[in-house]
Amino acid sequence: MAQSVSLSTIASPILSQKPGSSVKSTPPCMASFPLRRQLPRLGLRNVRAQAGGDGDNKDNSVEVHRVNKDDQGTAVERKPRRSSIDISPFGLLDPWSPMRSMRQMLDTMDRIFEDAITIPGRNIGGGEIRVPWEIKDEEHEIRMRFDMPGVSKEDVKVSVEDDVLVIKSDHREENGGEDCWSRKSYSCYDTRLKLPDNCEKEKVKAELKDGVLYITIPKTKIERTVIDVQIQ
């Protein structure tokens, strides 16, 4: 049900009145206002807030995501939203950060390739997608690849501590150019990767070739016991 209110003569406070001037009478009219329960619920999900001003037209917009009552707060993130392929594999997806499990790295790889396929404009021309590291969990062995450009065999140390694969490298290089400017390069790798239980830790093999470290870990043979159950 709507509420009806009768409006009579109204004078706007914004309009100035000169002394002696008369205000013309306005005939009464009817205005209907819906009750609060009749107002539709607004399903707003995204609200854009943009800074004002007379300066240059830079895009300072911020995406504000309104969360339902069940959520615990409001998520705010600056646009454009970056996907996992935009984040450097040596940043948030750093495989060299301490103590990662092999399952985490496999999940990260899946997420990278899914984003590259589903996001429009990615991988235009059918180019190859290559991340600086890769893990393949095969039937009889686990194979790993880590790109380590500029690193020699003497700079890399691979070891297994209990169930953890440890890869360390500290490479420094300094060259003097013909233009009297010295060139320095420094790379440091340090990772601890927890291995699954079905690995033969004593038979881990590592090879460094053309700046790429290849690691092969054989899997243990699982003996399956088959027991025939007699049906009565």
UniProtKB/Swiss-Prot annotation:
Superkingdom of origin organism: Eukaryota
Query: Where are the bilayer-spanning segments?
Result: none
Q: Which GO terms describe its biological process?
A: response to heat
Q: Where is the transit peptide?
A: 1-46
Q: Which InterPro entries match?
A: A-crystallin/Hsp20_dom, HSP20-like_chaperone, HSP21-like
One GO cellular component term, please give it. Answer: chloroplast
| PROSITE patterns per the UniProt record, alphabetical | SHSP
Q: List the keywords (alphabetical).
A: Chloroplast, Plastid, Stress response, Transit peptide
UniProt protein name: Small heat shock protein, chloroplastic
Q: What is the protein's species of origin?
A: Pisum sativum (Garden pea)
